């Protein structure tokens, strides 16, 4: 059996007020080519199909067109689950009708995980789609107040699946979670705080393959058969070194054989350029990829006049500027001792913070409001 595993499309994503729909469409066109070439036995999309719970019209049309071509024209079975960015009920609209075309969209968790059974020349393979489920929602679903962490949720689901799974059949688990040790990036929405979102990879040991979603870097998660495919595109500058693409998985009669990461090429890459502004602008004349999304890390010692405007003259899709010298100076200034900070008035500290973030001072009315709030909080704490 041949499987293509992908995840974290985040259709409709907007980056610094720039729509990425055309970039996402370009990546999906490449994915279509890979599917047409390989004609896999299944396509897995492991959550975060959309970037928002209420997706844009353009994002919905993009997904619809993809499903029509792959599930309709190519007749390749699709198995899709919701992630933490998705609205399960919205994603699974018309899912009962789509199942007739072997397009399986599982947006809402249920007490019993129903397998999707596909076959190859060696027999049946059981696919277990597990949409994202928070501990709070799981406590309600299972009527169990002792479910406190994501580990508790997944352990409950996996245990039940293993109990019911035919022992002589191959199995694939599809899930959207964070496995301990995975490499994270800035663009992944935190599932919870305090480490309660962490899952141990050893609970997946009895499956032949685990198709993971959530982390944006393609990587193994504790075992070779437990993998993140990574996101469709780079969605933050913390991902500039990622090699985006899809994961192709091969099974034989005994189960998992291999996985292969197949890169996809974006129309506009995401890069960081570093140097003084003058150096960056001079080097830009030789740059053949000036349409890329750019963050400039400037090493200038002196202040600059309209650096973003000047940068955009050469890099029209420049998104960020980071002043490295200023950052280093700020880091030195933050060494003020905790004792010294305690001596300062909280209202004045907030005023300094506000001016730093908003580049303007608090007006008289705002000063009074902050002072009133601080006084109330101080009275409560005393």
Model-assigned labels for residue ranges:
Residues 1-68, 75, 365-368, 372, ...:
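N-terminal active-site segment of His-dependent metallophosphoesterases
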Residues 6-7, 43-48, 77-84, 104-109, ...:
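Active-site neighborhood of phospho(di)ester-bond hydrolases with catalytic His/Asp-centered motifs
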Residues 10-13, 51-53, 81-91, 111-113, ...:
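Active-site environment of divalent metal-dependent phosphoester hydrolases
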Residues 16, 49-68, 82-101, 107, ...:
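Metal-dependent catalytic neighborhoods of phosphoester/phosphodiester hydrolases
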Residues 37, 42, 251-382:
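Accessory, non-catalytic peripheral segments of nucleic-acid enzymes
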Residues 40-58, 77-89, 171, 177-195:
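Active-site neighborhood of divalent metal-dependent phosphoester/pyrophosphate hydrolases
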Residues 93-197:
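Conserved catalytic scaffold of divalent metal-dependent phosphoesterases
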Residues 180, 185-255:
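Conserved beta-sheet core of the metallophosphoesterase superfamily
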């Amino acid at each position: 059996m041949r499987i293509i595993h992908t995840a974290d499309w985040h259709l409709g994503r907007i980056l610094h007020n720039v729509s990425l729909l055309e970039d996402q469409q370009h990546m999906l066109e490449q994915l279509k080519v890979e599917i047409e070439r390989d004609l896999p036995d299944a396509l897995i999309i492991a959550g975060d199909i959309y970037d928002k719970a209420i997706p844009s019209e353009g994002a919905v049309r993009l997904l619809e067109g993809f499903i029509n071509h792959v599930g309709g024209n190519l007749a390749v079975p699709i198995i899709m689950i919701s992630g933490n960015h998705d609205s399960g009920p919205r994603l699974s609209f018309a899912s009962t009708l789509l199942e007739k075309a072997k397009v399986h969209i599982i947006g809402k968790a249920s007490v019993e995980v129903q397998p999707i059974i596909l076959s190859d020349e060696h027999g049946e393979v059981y696919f277990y789609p597990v949409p994202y489920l928070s501990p709070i929602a799981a406590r309600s679903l299972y009527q169990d107040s002792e479910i406190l962490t994501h580990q508790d949720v997944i352990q409950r689901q996996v245990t039940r699946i293993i109990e019911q799974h035919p022992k002589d059949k191959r199995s694939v688990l599809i899930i959207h979670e964070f496995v301990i040790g995975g490499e994270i990036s800035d663009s992944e929405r935190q599932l919870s705080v305090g480490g309660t979102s962490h899952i141990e990879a050893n609970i997946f040991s009895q499956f032949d393959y685990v198709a993971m979603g959530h982390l944006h870097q393609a990587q193994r998660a504790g075992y070779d058969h437990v993998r993140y495919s990574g996101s469709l595109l780079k969605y933050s500058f913390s991902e500039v070194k990622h090699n985006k693409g899809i994961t192709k998985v091969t099974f034989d009669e005994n189960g998992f054989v291999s996985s292969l990461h197949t890169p996809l090429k974006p129309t506009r890459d995401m890069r960081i350029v570093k140097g003084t502004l003058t150096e960056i602008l001079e080097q830009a004349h030789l740059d053949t990829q000036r349409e890329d999304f750019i963050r400039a890390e400037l090493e200038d010692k002196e202040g600059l006049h309209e650096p973003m405007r000047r940068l955009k003259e050469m890099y029209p899709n420049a998104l960020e500027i980071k002043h490295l010298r200023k950052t280093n100076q700020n880091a030195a200034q933050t060494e003020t001792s905790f004792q010294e900070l305690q001596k300062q008035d909280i209202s004045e500290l907030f005023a300094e913070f506000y001016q730093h973030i908003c580049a303007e001072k608090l007006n008289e009315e705002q000063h009074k409001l902050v002072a009133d709030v601080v006084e109330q909080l101080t009275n409560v704490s005393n």
